[in-house]
Amino acid sequence: MTRNKFNEELKQLLNSVRVMGVNLEDTLDKVIANLEQKDAALAQQIISDDDNFDNSEVNIEKQCLELVLTQTPVATDWREIASCLKLVGDMERIADHCSDISQYTLKLIEKEPVPLPDNFMNMLQVMRQMVYDSISAISENDLELANKVIATDDEVDNYFAEMRQHLTTVMQQ
């Protein structure tokens, strides 16, 4: 494979990551809107769409492996490929969170309205910004922004654990 061909395939890889990110931003917007609308059909759609993120992750991982196996990447190429692998794994996990939130939403639709945990909307906004920053970091090779995203991941995990505990407690009552 020539270097030009490699660079073209690397561009395609980065584009696949961007598309997954844009789709995830859209899903996060749907989750946020559905918390107010409490639309069972929309919740089901979000849950079903999680399979698309699973497939995107697998396809992007295949693209990464193909790049590595067909040409020996230089150090900067390895960093970009490794960043893509890490990012798509994180985005897929966020998509899983969106699906989980939608499953909780379906359960809440069946019960009396329940107030959301205090930090819930903050969590979703942080997740959305994290996706946007991740795409920007990889597109612009911005290491500082990438480090910010990594630090933010723990914050999202903590928010999600709080939310899950709160909703589980409420549903058991």
Predicted features by range, described:
Residues 1-173:
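Cytosolic, long alpha-helical scaffolding segments
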